[in-house]
């Protein structure tokens, strides 16, 4: 979906690979929006996010899979990146956890600074979410 030969798309891809927080926006059953800052992995085609299983965002995604992801602005409004997508809750997939090498590489120092270990994070944040982009917006 991103054309890395285009400067703007390459910039979006670079930010998605290097930024450590992204805002996951979902919709509650009553139609009200919900926003949560989350850690994430971007592999070039989909996002992988881990959550505690009984959170508002998981309840939202069980009834509506439409999401909007947003990267924080870094240049006073000129570098906002939004991604519309469809979320899938990965149920019972023991192979996907916060102990993934790519996740530990990206967040290992932060996990350690929190006084935790990847295995503990994987146990606490056991619900994996895969988000497949449907539209990218770089402003």
Q: Regions from the language model: what does each represent?
A:
Residues 19-53, 59-61, 67-71, 81-82:
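Short beta-strand segments
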Residues 1-21, 77, 113:
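Extreme N-terminal tail/first-helix region
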Residues 55-56, 94:
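A generic structural signal for alpha-helix starts
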Residues 30-32, 75-77, 119-123:
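A short beta-turn/loop motif at secondary-structure boundaries
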